[in-house]
């Protein structure tokens, strides 16, 4: 499955109920997400793209662009 940044932003948008999301908008600081929201985003990404993200890695992926790079790298 080919992943695009739009795929990731769609997941974030659905989880947070926000229509417009920039590639580099930080989930917590700029989009107003709470910790549980971020966990839900991560779980949705894991399920959609069939990969595992360790809890300790979550702070390393605070934006849609960062999550996109992770999914793209692990999908190859």
For the regions a protein language model found, what residue spans apply to each?
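Phosphopantetheine carrier-protein modules
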Residues: 13-30, 48-60
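Phosphopantetheine-attachment site and its flanking helix in carrier
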Residues: 29-48
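C-terminal structural segments of small proteins and small subunits
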Residues: 52-54, 58-74
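Structural motif detector for alpha-helix initiation sites
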Residues: 5, 23-24, 38, 55, ...
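Generic structural marker for isolated residues within well-ordered, non-membrane alpha-helices
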Residues: 9, 24, 42
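Thiotemplate assembly-line natural product biosynthesis machinery
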Residues: 1-20, 72-76
């Amino acid at each position: 499955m080919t992943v695009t940044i739009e795929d990731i932003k769609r997941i974030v948008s659905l989880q947070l109920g926000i229509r417009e999301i920039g590639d580099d908008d930080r989930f917590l600081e700029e989009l107003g997400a709470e910790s549980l929201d971020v966990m839900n985003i991560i779980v949705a990404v894991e399920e959609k793209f069939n990969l595992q993200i360790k809890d300790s890695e979550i702070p390393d992926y605070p934006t849609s662009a960062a999550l996109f790079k992770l999914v793209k790298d692990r999908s190859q």
